[in-house]
Amino acid sequence: MLRNKRKAGKLVRAPQKAARIDSQANAHAEDHSDLEHSAPSTDDGFDEPKPTIAKKVSLSTAIPKKNKFKQRDDTKNVKPPTLEEMKELRDTQNLFHSNLFKLQVKEMLEELQLKQKYTDFIENWLESFTVFTRQLKDGLMERSHLEIPLKLSQKPTGFVFSKPTREPYLIGAAATGTLLGPKIVVDVALEMPKESLHKEDYLNLRYDQKRALYLTYVTERMKESPAYAQDQFNFNYYANNPLKPVLELTPGTKQVNKHLQVRLFITAPLSSFKPGRFVPWNNNIRPSYYGDEWDEKEPLPSTQHYNANVLFDLTLSENQTHLDKAFKGRRNFQDGLLLLKVWLRQRQLDIGYSGFGAHILSAFIVYLNTQRILHHSSSSYQVARTVWNQLANTDWTKGISLSLVPIQTEELNKFAEQYDVCFIDFTGQHNLCANIPLYLYQRVREEAKLAVELLNDMKLNSFPLIFMQKCPLYSRVDNILKISNYSCINQMLTLHSQPRFKYDFAKYGYPQLLQLLTELLKKGLAERVHSILPLETATPAWPVENKAPVIGNYIQLGLILQPEHAYEVLNKGPAANDDPEGAEEFRRFWGEKSNLRRFQDGSITEAVVWGSAQDSPAKKRLIVRQIVLHLLEHQLQLDSKDVQYIAGELDQVYKLSPWFKVNKLKTKLSLDQDTDAEALSPHAIRSYDELARQLHGLNDLPLEIVSISGVSPVFRYCEPQPVLPQARLVENRILTSSIQRVVIQLGQSGKWPNELSALRALKTAFLIEIGEKLEAQCHLHWMMSADGLLVLKQGYCFLIELAHNKELALLKQEVTERGITTYIDNAASRSLERQHYILPKVSGALHSLHQTYSAFGSTVLLAKRWLATQLLDDGLWPDMATELLVAHLFQQRYAPQPIEAPQTGFIRFLQLLAFSDFNGELFLLNFNNSWQEQQVADLEHNYRSNRQSYPPLAVATSYDMQHAGRLWTSEESPSQRVLGHVTRLARHALEIIETSLLSKDLRFVRPAQLFRASNEGYDLVIQFKPDLVPNSLSYDLGSPFVSFSQPNFNLTRAGSGDVARIVGLLRSAYSDFAAFFYNPHGGKELAIVWRPPTEFAAKPFKVTELQACSPCGNGRVQVIKETLVEDFKLLLKDFYLRIATPEELKREQREHQKPKRYFDAKQTEEKSTPKPKVRKANEKEAPPKKKRLIKSSALKALK
């Protein structure tokens, strides 16, 4: 037993030592980092083993039982495990679900430790600043050269500066030892003496004015001091609060100026005012201060938020003192708080006026310690886990308290009634969560609950999901509402904000808007919305010489929808007979949208209808948008043009092209011109279902059809091209724009031949017989092709393939030199197995996923369209890889709520491409949890140990069997270069989206900005003949090379796929010399990038290296680009129109030359072009119609 423990102990320690060596090497290699690797703490806060356990162990090793049989004693040379080894082993087993997770946490904590140079600088700076404050002198503040960082309604006069009587001190993370990079912010507090304040300064913002003046005076003296001559001075608002200006000082020292910033707060002692002056139910801003009249008989409205704003300063010193006592010398608490801060920052829940700051988490750790939920010896992991667990399971809306003096339940309830969230500080006077809205607090709880669930999932490495992945709040919401029009903001505040909110927030517009809009939307959307979250960005700092900016005239809200109710087309009100007052209120709230309606159950009630049940999914996803805009217009008099509601803007890219007219289609289906690929998929699926029933019902087949599976993307709602019923039979040929593949399997029989070609011939005979039966019994047209049986049904073309296990076995069969038959996987067998056996299962699983998450299919459509418009076809980036990566997003719990908006799903897909570690991460989709935990662990272990045997992008499903990780992608598709290219494209796209989303002035990104490739970086562009390449049926956002012109929607012969086939030939023959890019969705240009010049250098003549080479003398050969271009033309044959460089095409655009892309393009004439073709186009030549008339009259004369 001890021997096993000892071995396990070694296994635990060895990776730690290796990880420590690696981390130290990285620390030496990256000296510019603002973080350093400190030696791990010997006291990690875990419980030491009890002495009784140690005694038992020593007894069992010291007095072994005698055995009468002579045995070899293996324990003589084995040292007993140390207490530390036993402790680490027990901790790994009991606390962490894997040794890897523990090592990752430990390594991250070591990397987060502050470098000594920063610690020394902070101590020295604080000492020098203390000396500086001692040198300050009392006096009247005269005219300042700096602007006061506060918008004052009255100009201050006669401010007398009093020298601080208390030395400046560190607050926040710098005091608790939990500073976090990459930008280290050191908070320093300077306390105004009590003499600077008068007893009436609690009223009408006087305290805030004096605080700002005090800060201005200290800043001006600092700028005059030689000690700070090289430093940069800026003012900023703490937490976007215009009443909380702070000084941001960037030191001029080169060693730290890039990564460190000092922030100076001005505070005041708690004894400056009478106790109870700032309790939440008191009023400290009189209506007369803003020129308002108030009835003296009415009680003054409470100013609980303003009171909390002042109490933040007054209680800061005492709160910090207690936090310092709790964290000082406790590395486990400090490291636990660091883990929580990383988690919070990655989710951007700590930004802005309503942010859930890290100081709340530090106070909560102390609270849990005082409640004996956390122990002093708890490890950092236990601290973080306990905080998450308690956050998820405690309710702060009823109030919790850290007060040293016990607070009565009635008083705590009275406190809690004034705020959405209540957490009383050590003084018992200040609510630490005064500015946090209810929805944001609930969001924090949900994220904490998710973190605990991820930790409990033994099948998952939860470390990157919790700590490494960036989860900006805008990527967690489904819809976004932006209001930035200054006049509209003022109008809303003036007409609709209640006076008590104006006094409560000291006329600051942002929280008033947040309160007004949240209440309105909460009432109007009700069960349709899960959360309404403020999306804030930090206010930028400004030079101390400039005036303070006006903030709060802009608001942005994120809506997380409730999938069960968000898309309901009806708002049903109360019945007028039963509840006349309720019905009247309903009509007043909804206005003209409300109508009296009679329902099938006989009830007659007020109701609002937002659409019909037959509307497309895209239209239903905009119902919430319709409701919000109506409420803003009806209740707040906001016109829709003054509001930006972001929902479904990118859906345009998979809509049907407006150039294609559906009314010309001969079909019984009722199709709308404004339809899209998502709405058209059910029509194709219903046609497939009917075909499947007809196949099952065929009579007199030699073998019964036992399985039918649709494997085309349309059957799982993943086809970005609108699939229209336009296939038709013309001169015994089926013309169509797309083919839907179907795989069938027949019943068992032992009469199938054992030779591959004979078996395939028999399969063809079976398919022909099925076609004849379909024609005879179901009146369907059919044709045979090289790939299978083509069947025309209801305007759709289906390709039926026959799968048989023996064909797969014969493909794998090989005979050795000794005549032994072996079965070995090869490219052909893997392709057949994927197409006929694995893809049907995966396709069914993805279809089921779409039924569970309605946004899955449309997210795939956006992802596929984006990749295609970046000139990445299936040969460079497999379509199935895109589908599986999106499915991975929906399967993994990255967020507390599933994705409801395709636009949000697309943003998360871009984040996945931009920030994933493709070299170290295997994307596994365990459909229906069909793989056991051990199978998943074995695959991941094999992936890590044999990484070089897997493709650059490794995607696996639970149906892949022995091919897991190697089936859906390959070394060339996508290659390492293409993967890097896609990563850069995704990061650039995210930058564009984030800039447009978070900017106050910009509107949301237009689809053309994302879904059109750049025309930079290509060497050549080959244009195809436009009449031979049909346009995409989806909305065309244009080519990066050539302007728009008349589109071409001609149908091609079923199964031709000429462009894709030719590009595949070019890649197979010339991929060593050039890379080929084109848009598979109707692209009419082929962009070429040459390989590096070394591939075209002259080299010695070798028989094995003569591909595409030409002799260049002296027994050497060389690949010549001009020769390759001629080869490209030869392979393209009739498709080739002309070849040009991107620069030439740009010049044509600038010179307004006629675009050479579509029907009006004239083919570039070669020297060998015969002249009669030119004469044929001559308008002066006699028309052929005249010739026919002459010929016709001659024929009549012969009669």
UniProtKB/Swiss-Prot annotation:
Q: Where in the cell is it found?
A: Nucleus, Nucleolus; Chromosome
From the UniProt annotation, give the residues forming the signal peptide: none
Q: Where is the composition biased (Basic residues)?
A: 1-10
Q: Does the keyword Cytoplasm apply?
A: no
GO CC: one term?
condensed nuclear chromosome
Biased composition (Basic and acidic residues) is annotated at 28-37, 1146-1169
Chief subcellular site?
A: nucleus
Q: Which GO terms describe its biological process?
A: ribosomal small subunit biogenesis; rRNA processing; tRNA export from nucleus
- Domain of life, per the record? Eukaryota
| Gene Ontology molecular functions | RNA binding
Sorted UniProt keywords: Chromosome, Nucleus, RNA-binding
Positions of the UniProt region annotated as Disordered: 1-51, 1146-1199
Matches recorded under Pfam families? Nrap, Nrap_D2, Nrap_D3, Nrap_D4, Nrap_D5, Nrap_D6
Nucleus keyword on record: yes
Query: What task does this protein carry out?
Result: Part of the small subunit (SSU) processome, first precursor of the small eukaryotic ribosomal subunit. During the assembly of the SSU processome in the nucleolus, many ribosome biogenesis factors, an RNA chaperone and ribosomal proteins associate with the nascent pre-rRNA and work in concert to generate RNA folding, modifications, rearrangements and cleavage as well as targeted degradation of pre-ribosomal RNA by the RNA exosome.
- Identify its protein family: Belongs to the NRAP family.
How this chain assembles, per its entry, is:
Part of the small subunit (SSU) processome, composed of more than 70 proteins and the RNA chaperone small nucleolar RNA (snoRNA) U3.
In Swiss-Prot or TrEMBL terms, this protein is called Nucleolar protein 6
